[in-house]
Amino acid sequence: MKISVGCDHGALALKNKVVAHLEKQGHEVKDFGTHTLDSCDYPEFAAAAAKAVASGECEKGIVLCTTGIGVSISANKIDGIRCALLSDVWSAKMTRLHNDTNMMALGAGIVGENLALEIVDTWVGTEFSGEERHQRRIDKLMALEK
């Protein structure tokens, strides 16, 4: 699977661990940065990762900052994106099963490395249920963009 990633300086270390973990599993990762600890603005990195998903260049995307809040808001500003801020495995599973999210956000100051990788594995590995009631709700949600 081709997965976009993006982060700010506050989540660089965790992003690098997530990227290495995904690549080890055989996923192709497109890393939109940041690549240094220099202070930077999360919207540009989150938006770049989200645009890659929205355009179809990548199938899914993962964005990170210290809390995950800023990058999730930024990603959700891009048409076609459904980004969930995740801090537990149950939500990672349910947001794929019911909401067919195409992006997820993590807070490096909220989840540790082990939990983050477990969340990533669950989210990446869970398919949308395809149930009519969930698709109907997603369609209504996406219609709000128009």
Write out the residue ranges for each language-model feature.
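A short beta-strand-loop structural module common to alpha/beta enzyme folds
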Residues: 28-39
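Helix-adjacent hinge/juxtasegments
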Residues: 45-85
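A general structural signal for well-ordered alpha-helical segments in protein cores
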Residues: 15, 42, 46, 72, ...
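Glycine-rich phosphate/diphosphate-binding loop of Rossmann-like nucleotide-binding domains
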Residues: 5-24
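SAM-dependent methyltransferases
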Residues: 1-2, 23, 49, 144-146
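C-terminal binding/interaction regions
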Residues: 4, 10-11, 89-146
